[in-house]
């Protein structure tokens, strides 16, 4: 995810320059930074928070969809943090039997996504405030939600990741996919969330499910994890 300029308050909270000081929770800070991308870059991969190329964005969509175990059977999928709904564009270009729903905290992104895909379902919700009324889905994908942390300190970002994963996992019947920045890099950026394998695995394995797969075999300096309720083959 991309970035803005941040202002630190006397309480140690960080707010994007130009944003309301009330915007201080991790989810609202990250959402505000992404909305700045939307304003700056419009309907493009940069407007959705990707910094490299359209190809890298497309690669990530395929990685997210790789969580689906049986690609031949119908499945419902929640695109959590859907942004402009570009994953739905990808699904329309590469058809599969997937019932798509998009969800985002940002009203600006949801408004734009609904204009782009008027027949699709999009939900505007902050699930950390309340997930009441959010249906369950076969699969949930969280693409790019945890890559960027801006001025949020590491421990706060870690707790945010744990909290959001706990809530979202309640709403997947089969599995979910998420990505984070890798620690296996030449150098780390202070504004990105580089999550160690063992920290990730300890939480996922003890709090969510011991049935998970780590994908670290693609070009980006990140990794994708698939978490399943049941072991493979069942």
What positions do the PLM features span?
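A short SAM/SAH-binding and catalytic strip from SAM-dependent methyltransferases
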Residues: 139-158
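Conserved SAM-binding strand-loop segment of SAM-dependent methyltransferases
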Residues: 118-128
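Conserved SAM-binding loop of SAM-dependent methyltransferases across substrates and taxa
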Residues: 84-96
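Conserved SAM/SAH-binding beta-strand->alpha-helix loop
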Residues: 106
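N-terminal, positively charged/glycine-rich alpha-helical extensions of SAM-dependent methyltransferases
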Residues: 2-46
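Conserved class I S-adenosyl-L-methionine
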Residues: 74-83
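Conserved SAM-binding loop
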Residues: 113-114
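Conserved alpha-helix/loop element of class I SAM-dependent methyltransferases that forms part
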Residues: 55-73
